[in-house]
């Protein structure tokens, strides 16, 4: 303790006994021990407080790093999402335009009783079947077949 050996401590104790006397010496030892305990406690408290503050500073630094990382990721995601949304918007607009074109084609065909452009092949097949049916069947059966074709056309229109 304090760089003193056993012999030096013994000399200090003998001098203290001679100087203080046998009546005051025990009380002086108790006071010195209390003083060293208080100093030790104060130093430990200071050390703990310093450790906590250092730990808090480290946590603050880590928090700031995570915050910056999070903000960077959010910014990068904003850019990606905007690009993806633009792509989806363009695709949706193209699909809407395609559907509108089909609807206009159907409306024109209904107004003029002509066949829509995209159904020409299907209708020509149906006409060929109708011609075959008309040659083999009575007019009443041909009318039923035509009604069925009209119903199918209406169903397609509803689905679109």
UniProtKB/Swiss-Prot annotation:
GO terms for cellular component: TAT protein transport complex. Keywords: Cell inner membrane, Cell membrane, Membrane, Protein transport, Translocation, Transmembrane, Transmembrane helix, Transport. The chain crosses the membrane at residues 1-21. It is a single-pass membrane protein. One of its GO terms (molecular function) is protein transmembrane transporter activity. GO terms for biological process: protein transport by the Tat complex. It comes from the Bacteria. Residues 128-140, 149-160 have a biased composition (Basic and acidic residues). Its main location: membrane. Residues 118-160 are annotated as: Disordered. Gene3D superfamilies: 1.20.5.3310. It is found in: Cell inner membrane. Part of the twin-arginine translocation (Tat) system that transports large folded proteins containing a characteristic twin-arginine motif in their signal peptide across membranes. Together with TatC, TatB is part of a receptor directly interacting with Tat signal peptides. TatB may form an oligomeric binding site that transiently accommodates folded Tat precursor proteins before their translocation. The Tat system comprises two distinct complexes: a TatABC complex, containing multiple copies of TatA, TatB and TatC subunits, and a separate TatA complex, containing only TatA subunits. Substrates initially bind to the TatABC complex, which probably triggers association of the separate TatA complex to form the active translocon. Belongs to the TatB family. This is Sec-independent protein translocase protein TatB. It comes from Helicobacter pylori (strain ATCC 700392 / 26695).
């Amino acid at each position: 303790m304090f760089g003193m050996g056993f012999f030096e401590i013994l000399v200090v104790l003998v001098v203290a006994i001679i100087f203080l006397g046998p009546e005051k010496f025990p009380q002086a030892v108790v006071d010195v021990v209390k003083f060293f305990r208080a100093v030790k406690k104060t130093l430990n408290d200071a050390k703990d407080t310093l450790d906590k503050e250092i730990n808090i500073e480290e946590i603050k630094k880590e928090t700031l790093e995570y915050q910056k990382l999070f903000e960077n990721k959010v910014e990068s995601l904003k850019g990606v999402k905007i690009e993806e949304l633009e792509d989806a918007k363009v695709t949706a607009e193209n699909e809407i335009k395609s559907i509108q074109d089909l609807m206009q084609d159907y409306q024109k065909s209904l107004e003029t009783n002509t066949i829509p452009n995209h159904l020409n092949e299907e209708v020509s097949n149906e006409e060929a079947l109708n011609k075959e049916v008309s040659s083999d069947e009575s007019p009443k059966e041909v009318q039923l077949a035509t009604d069925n074709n009209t119903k199918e056309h209406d169903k397609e229109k509803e689905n679109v």
